[in-house]
C-alpha cells in the first residue's frame, strides 16, 4: 500500500482528481491511498473542499513538501479535520528562517559553501503546528528532515 502526496498532475485537490487516481491505479498490484491537498493547488492559501475529498476517499490532508506558512490557514484546517476523523500531514518549515537554504545547516554545509537551513526553521514551525493541533483536538503527522529535535 502507498499513501500518495497531493503534489501530482493534476493536484489532488478535488473529487475528480481523486477519482482519476483511483481509476488509474485500480489494476495495479499496490493499493493507493490518496492524501488530498490541504489547500487549493497546494498553494497554502485557501483550504480545499476537505469534506468532499474525505468522502471521495482521502485518508489525510497535506500540501506535500510545501509547508503551510499561514497559521490561520492551518488552524482552520485542523478545526475541519478534527470534525471528520482525519489528519494533517505537514512538513514544518518556517520559510522566514530557511529562506533559500538547500541543505541542513552544519559544518559540512559551511565547508561546501552551501547555504544551510537551520534546524530551528523546523522546530519553530513544528511547535506552532503542535499548539494549533492541540487547540483544535486534531491529529498531525509531521515529516521532518533536520533531525534537530
Report residues per predicted region.
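Metal-associated gating/positioning segment near the N- to mid-region
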Residues: 1-26
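Short beta-strands and strand-loop turn motifs
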Residues: 1-6, 32-36, 59-63, 110-113
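Short acidic, glycine/proline-enriched helix-loop-strand junctions
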Residues: 14-16, 30-31, 81-86
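Acidic (Asp/Glu)-rich catalytic clusters
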Residues: 21-27, 50-55
Amino acid at each position: 500500500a502507498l499513501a500518495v502526496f497531493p503534489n501530482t498532475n493534476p493536484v489532488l485537490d478535488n473529487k475528480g482528481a481523486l477519482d482519476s487516481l483511483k481509476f488509474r491505479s485500480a489494476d495495479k498490484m499496490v493499493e493507493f491511498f490518496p492524501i488530498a491537498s490541504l489547500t487549493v493547488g497546494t498553494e497554502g492559501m485557501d483550504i480545499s473542499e476537505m469534506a468532499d475529498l474525505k468522502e471521495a476517499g482521502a485518508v489525510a490532508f497535506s500540501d506535500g513538501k510545501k509547508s503551510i506558512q499561514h497559521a490561520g490557514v492551518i488552524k482552520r484546517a485542523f478545526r475541519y479535520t478534527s470534525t471528520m476523523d482525519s489528519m494533517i500531514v505537514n512538513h514544518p518549515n518556517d520559510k522566514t528562517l530557511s529562506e533559500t537554504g538547500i541543505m541542513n545547516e552544519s559544518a559540512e554545509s559551511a565547508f561546501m559553501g552551501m547555504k544551510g537551513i537551520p534546524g530551528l526553521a523546523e522546530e519553530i514551525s513544528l511547535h506552532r503546528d503542535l499548539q494549533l493541533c492541540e487547540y483544535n483536538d486534531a491529529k498531525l503527522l509531521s515529516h521532518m528532515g533536520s533531525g534537530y529535535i
